[in-house]
Amino acid sequence: MKIGKFVIEGNAAIMGILNVTPDSFSDGGSYTTVQKALDHVEQMIADGAKIIDVGGESTRPGCQFVSATDEIDRVVPVIKAIKENYDILISIDTYKTETARAALEAGADILNDVWAGLYDGQMFALAAEYDAPIILMHNQDEEVYQEVTQDVCDFLGNRAQAALDAGVPKNNIWVDPGFGFAKSVQQNTELLKGLDRVCQLGYPVLFGISRKRVVDALLGGNTKAKERDGATAALSAYALGKGCQIVRVHDVKANQDIVAVLSQLM
């Protein structure tokens, strides 16, 4: 499997989540020192992660805005330390070009933009400048759709075209349907059922639903975040079967066997 110029063994891969934030919904505050972050990265790599997704600002509903300066202070030391110690691809989870540039300079390989270039109009130019793969996630302000799966597909197709127009090569573009972002539980469920349509857009698809509210709803409600890892793994299997190629998860080990087996059947 290729992500732009980068080659990953197999036809599917796990992206391990590293939140260096104090307020992420699942693990906020757990990895706010470089050493704690490195220890977690080492474990995720041992468990089978092929990409580490570093985020310095929580994107959960109601989270506090973080300036680019503060975000850079959080992510750059961690990215540098990971690159100094491990041979692993790093994605930077940010929608700010200033942070993205600093992360790329520090050694990050991939851009992961939860606003698909809408928040910062220079993100695509930056991706083109660095020949960096970019993941474009569906997002919007309100939970209003005519038909959620079609609307998501239209959005992703339009944003991918905007990236192409800005000089980003097609093989550097990935898409993410954005589970949990501006979507009700019902809308997330409908989107899950239509996931194969997203996978038919012509771009590789990242699947990120780990520990989110829709997983809790599918389990009947009232579960804690870390109690959703088994269901997350089941949904990873479902997504890979629909055609997704990367699963973004908190618990790498719970997903590794699924990815290892299904990767050989894709």
From Swiss-Prot:
Signal peptide: none annotated. (7,8-dihydropterin-6-yl)methyl diphosphate binds at T59, D93, N112, D176, K212, R248, V249, H250. InterPro entries: DHP_synth-like, DHP_synth_dom, Dihydropteroate_synth-like_sf, Pterin-binding_dom. Keywords: Folate biosynthesis, Magnesium, Metal-binding, Transferase. Its EC number is 2.5.1.15. One of its GO terms (molecular function) is metal ion binding. One of its GO terms (biological process) is tetrahydrofolate biosynthetic process. It catalyses: (7,8-dihydropterin-6-yl)methyl diphosphate + 4-aminobenzoate = 7,8-dihydropteroate + diphosphate. Belongs to the DHPS family. PANTHER family: FOLATE SYNTHESIS PROTEINS, FOLIC ACID SYNTHESIS PROTEIN FOL1. This is Dihydropteroate synthase. It comes from Streptococcus pyogenes serotype M1. The gene is folP.
